A protein has these predicted regions:
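Onset of an N-terminal alpha helix
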Residues: 2-6, 22-25
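Membrane-helix interface segments
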Residues: 41-43, 85
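Divalent metal-dependent phosphate-bond-processing catalytic cores, especially two-metal-ion Mg2+/Mn2+ enzymes
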Residues: 13-22, 26, 30-39, 52, ...
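Hydrophobic, well-structured mid-protein blocks that either form specific transmembrane helices
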Residues: 82-116
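His-Asp-centered metal-binding catalytic motifs of divalent-metal-dependent phosphohydrolases/nucleases
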Residues: 43-61, 68, 90-99
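Short, well-structured alpha-helical segments
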Residues: 22, 26-29, 47, 86-94
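Generic N-terminal amphipathic, Lys/Arg-enriched alpha-helix
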Residues: 4-15
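An active-site-proximal "capping" alpha-helix that borders the catalytic cofactor pocket
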Residues: 28, 66-78
Length: 228
């Protein structure tokens, strides 16, 4: 069943190159399997939630899908997932994600916490840098500088609505590290998640330090030292 669902998700997400494609989902699945091996949690529920956590993402499928979890519910029903398991998977998906965390909504079950950790881990470290850059480059066609503007500083206390707002002035590649990515280390639930997040966090800090050095931005290095 898992392999069949993987193939369906791969087809559904085909062509998405902004950091939320199947490659991201596959990494979240593998990270989830690694974390669940260290915890006493339901492996099937963790696996399903990991594979389906982005198939109704509001950035890709709109707010209506995100609220109803249309694709996740359909895929589970088509593959014979029982009602109780499907409900637990949907509860996990409904309670994870950074925009929800800004509202204080976090997963309450161990299974949900494992998938949340895996999802946030893939947002940081080397893969996180690549995903964030890919998303920024996708948006560069608008004519705005989506990479870095040394005169536009991050907004550190965004509400969910502000965070999701398109074309927000501070929303560029470098500022995204400060507005989200550097905060994720402290949002881990599991022991394994915290250990891996620490490694990936240090990589991002090193990347930013070198970026600011090469671009002769000592004021940004000072800012980073206050935030890291």
């Amino acid at each position: 069943m898992i392999d069949k669902i993987k193939n369906e998700v791969r087809q559904l997400m085909f062509g998405n190159n902004d950091g939320h494609g199947f490659d991201h989902i596959e990494r979240v699945y593998e990270l989830s399997m690694k974390l669940v091996a260290e915890e006493k949690a339901d492996k099937q529920i963790v696996g399903l939630a990991a594979l389906l956590h982005d198939v109704d993402d509001y950035k890709l499928f709109g707010d209506d899908n995100a609220e109803k979890l249309t694709n996740a519910r359909r895929i589970m029903e088509d593959n014979g997932v029982n009602t109780e398991t499907a409900a637990k998977v949907c509860d996990i998906i409904s309670n994870m994600g950074y925009s929800k965390a800004l509202k204080g909504i976090r997963p309450q079950t161990l299974e949900g916490q494992i998938v949340s950790d895996a999802d946030m881990l893939d947002a940081i470290g080397a893969n996180g840098v690549i995903r964030t850059l890919a998303y920024a480059l996708e948006r560069c066609h608008s004519g705005n500088n989506q990479i870095f503007d040394k005169n536009i500083w991050p907004e550190l206390f965004l509400t969910t609505e502000e965070y999701k707002k398109p074309d927000r002035p501070s929303d560029n590649f470098i500022n995204h590290f400060f507005e989200k990515l550097l905060r994720l280390k402290k949002m881990m639930f599991t022991s394994g998640g915290r250990k891996e997040a620490d490694i990936r966090h240090k990589f991002m800090v090193g990347f930013l330090e070198e970026f600011f050095r090469e671009n002769n931005c000592p004021e940004w290095i000072e800012y980073l030292n206050k935030q890291k």
